[in-house]
Amino acid sequence: MKIFVPLLSFLLAGLTTGLDWWEHGNFYQVYPRSFKDSDGDGIGDLDGVTEKLKYLKDIGMDGVWLSPIFSSPMADFGYDISNFREIQTEYGDLDAFQRLSDKCKQLGLHLILDFVPNHTSDQHEYFKKSVQKDETYKDFYVWHPGVHGPNNTKVPPSNWISVFRGSSWEWNEERQEFYLHQFLKEQPDLNYRNPAVVEEMKNVLRYWLDRGVSGFRIDAVPYLFESDIIDGRYRNEPESRTTDDPENPAYLVHTQTMDQPETYDMIYQWRAVLDEYSKTDNRTRIMMTEGYTSLPKIIEFFGNATANGAQIPFNFEVISNVKKNSTGADFATYVKRWLDAKPANRRSNWVLGNHDNNRLGSRLGENKIDLYNIALQTLPDIAVTYYGEEIGMLDQWIPWNETVDPAACRSDEASYSAYSRDPARTPMQWDSGKNAGFSKAAKTWLPVADNYKTLNVKIQDRARKSHLKIFKKLTKYRKRQILTEGDIDIKVSGENLLVYKRKVDKVGYVVVALNFGTEPVALGLSSLFDRADQRMQVVVSSNRVSTPDNVWVDVDNYVLIGESGIVLQYLWGKNPIVS
């Protein structure tokens, strides 16, 4: 059966010149524990990151975003913070942080920290004092005495379920009350209805801004507020009827524990703190927000008519919806959905991987690694890359006895692999030496991937063509005017050929062709775009494509092999040479 997909097309106006540093920025997520170990303990650290900053500069990055580095008992690998103003000792200390910050400035890189405001560790002094009903801290968290249950017992005040399964309420014997935890029981939720909490968390931001950071990525934003208490009780959430497992968070529709109206005002208040600093030296501090929620809710993070919010509310349309068998038409749908929803005066961003998802090649297809990196670097505005995706790192199977991810460890040996995020967090593969050049330790915190001897930075940097070489060429090329300012016209031909054109009048245009299918397809550009020139110059293509860079090709008859991409250019009035 032949499937016909109608031609999709839409056009966006060109962007203005004089861009701020972040508006067309390339951001790189470093998972510090896995990036580079400088002291031989098998765990990555800040001095290791500092050692590799030159590499990040060389591959075209503008911003370096660090996953959490603050003091933590590591119940959730840094997302359970016991002191917001200290560095986790495994990663270094404040002096190591200062070395990192200074080196970033020297190289022209912007340092972004992970800010985890929804909760703390249960080992934080805030929580310990709250348990003791210290006058200052007694209402720093969400407490409730419980309601009467059978046989004169106390039961939780609502049916809320945590992200990590089971009740969101945990009984504290010392205080004789329940406390709320939307994540692990070791991660009690802060009470943002308390003005003292709001001010204290603003002061945490100021502390790190004073130390020179360029912004923050805000974790788990939709969970900041819950619906307020009414008549001594919290409102129950309705059943979703999508699962019969009452411990599963999907058992409920989270109408009371996510996306509350007060959340957006809190984001706007934090943006105001960042702007205080930006005004003092005319250097923009940025906010990224993480929220796995509906697209309209994500768009609200941008701000409104009276208040600015996050410059970069993470766009999860692709990461949440595109699968290994997705077509070009599918991909275009999710790209268009974001572009249609985004306010005209805001910047797009594209996120294809992170520490909570399987690696790009494992999730979407190893053959398509370059295809997706081509898309990431040529779609409008901001790109975010998870460490190792530039070389095509893949998930590494981790046996049960070496699994450390709390999400997996709370299951069992039969089912843990469905929950574990460890496979996408293995050490960075720098070279073919011991532990892939990550560490000199006898044992690393997670096993190094089995393929490190053939898949690493050193090998790819020396190859004639490789994922890394393609990535570096893309990041260099995307700084050109057509990709920083150009409008975009997207079309889908058949089911699997996605083609988009970026153009600047009187300068030229770039055409990006992505073949999501397994079969070769002729581009046929003259049938897709008006005034398409017959011949265009190859800028860069997937590793699977044999056509050399810089050659000119017939854009109607050129055949693009399956699961690959190519970038073509035509500069008006010039015979372009691509460096």
Swiss-Prot record:
GO terms for cellular component: extracellular region. Saliva (at protein level). Proximal lateral lobes of the salivary gland (at protein level). SMART domains: Aamy (SM00642). Keywords: Allergen, Calcium, Glycoprotein, Glycosidase, Hydrolase, Secreted, Signal. InterPro entries: Glyco_hydro_13_cat_dom (IPR006047), Glycoside_hydrolase_SF (IPR017853), O16G_dom_2 (IPR045857). Glycans are attached at residues 118, 151, 282, 304, 325, 401. N-acetyl-beta-D-glucosamine binds at residue 325. One of its GO terms (molecular function) is alpha-1,4-glucosidase activity. The active site is at 219 (nucleophile), 290 (proton donor). The record marks 356 as: Transition state stabilizer. Its main location: secreted. This is Salivary alpha-glucosidase.
